């Protein structure tokens, strides 16, 4: 019975991949025709036309609303396009903690079956496996490294409640002793991206510190990986609040001069071509 359940789950995951990609060469062609708004030029373009630029990048950030299947389909399109163009690709994911890297490596090597890996996923992330399984199955089947970027949630919760200064030396050491300096510009960005949060200035400051720690650790982890793999481009998948240029991208640029590109999905009322500029993103995925 358990074997049958595993087979059904695997079949469902592969069917979902096919549905999201549309199948075969036609799917690849359709993906390249995806409408994109070029924020810098103020014009619409397609994924195919931006590919030459993406080939020059070391990091490509692709944002999401975690529960939106269309956003995950777009993320997979970018990964697949780069892989099929012959580039060495790694996928950095907010959805996994850094200490889950041994299990991620086993998954990509094909040494953990889907049932076992789904449990590892569930221990890291609270959203349904079906939302991310097409990306993770594609990575496994094509031996594309998956890199955990996230910080343990108990640390970010503690910072949000009582501030960065409340962390122990061991906790700070786990984070790589990253600095946490929140300025007015970053606080204004957080207000815009997350709608305020907190009750009172001190709580909001702590919330900003938690986001800063989160963004910084993900950026440093990505930089460490690409420094060790100079022929690889990393595609970072994270929520839109982390992918806006003021977040992970800024923390990367503060530490290294490397070419990178930021994609945000179109979200009516918050992420639209008339509501963002090149301080937020380079491209906006247009809603199909």
Across the structure, where does each feature detected by a protein language model lie?
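Bacterial N-terminal signal peptides
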Residues: 14-23
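Compositional signal for N-terminal targeting/processing segments
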Residues: 25-288
